[in-house]
């Protein structure tokens, strides 16, 4: 292990994983302060649905909890608060602070411009809202269009304006943005847990079972394919198998460290993970909506088992949630509550993430005592699992259970807490999703696939020929017939 990992608290101020926890907890504590009469939320801006013919600042933006504020003031405060917090984190993580600040500001402006455009009624409004906005036509794409538009803009920058992309890379941190949003998503899950405790329990338990069954199939099949068909070395097959079977980049890096693989391997696999995650993000939400519009929880769970980065999974889950709810309202006459399909995807993904440390530990033991046959060369302990464990999961669980305990203290406390949290949670989480989409596009460079033909071919075959079909089958077995609450 390196020096950074010699203490349990190492990295708490220097890693994106931990800073996702700190930023999420800061926002959660701002919400909790409402219980003592402090109003520290409500300043967050959020876009509103609007039409081209009636464009105005007041029409496209609004304050999430302070209606007396001008929307421009809410947007300015939103920028100042998040700029201060992210720059503090960037300084602590030893980023180039000046470059991060400039890049963050550019990303923030682009994100909000795209978000506002994506909320134009011709793009977003459902068929039931046409009369409300005076529309004669509309695409009824829902909020998912904003995410897709952000991704497309990012891809254009990442592949056609590469100097700009390289400059923005210091601020384009999709994994950090999405992990921060997921930590705060814990409060939304807390609300859902109180509203539908039985359903949450069933979803969590079936999610654990589905994840375990799927993973026990994924890794050995992909590893065997890599070794016997593609004739990869043991370390290459192991790193790629973990990357595509567990959770992408984190698993590839953890596995490489555990088995002491060649340094280039996790880098190659990470590139493949990011690029293929982009394809999954674009294809799978619409595909699942089309093939099984009446199985929302199956689709969400299958997405969580298939998409291999936290950022892309959360982003794809948000898009799937929007697409399936819009489709159900338009074609089935059912209005599902927001967030439950996304939660099915994230819950499954989080169980997979929690397995990283355990699997890295198992592989380390196998490599030391079986593959390398050099006992005593490496000392494996519980601290290894701790340092591999995704810390944002701890933040997510802490916020989730803390909200439940605080809200359970009385109906008045629950109402106060919910009002204060809702003023920040939804807009903040969605803004982080938007930042994730545009950042994924910016860091995705298709030209980097050159020279990785064998690994790329194996990754594609394993993903679409093994992982996706098995994931959907397992999700179908464990989640078939489960439905989100109806409004």
UniProtKB/Swiss-Prot annotation:
This is UPF0324 membrane protein NE0724. It is a multi-pass membrane protein. Keywords: Cell membrane, Membrane, Transmembrane, Transmembrane helix. Belongs to the UPF0324 family. GO terms for cellular component: plasma membrane. The chain crosses the membrane at residues 19-38, 71-93, 100-119, 139-161, 181-200, 204-226, 269-291, 350-369, 389-411, 426-443, 456-478. Its main location: membrane. InterPro entries: UPF0324_pro. It is found in: Cell membrane.
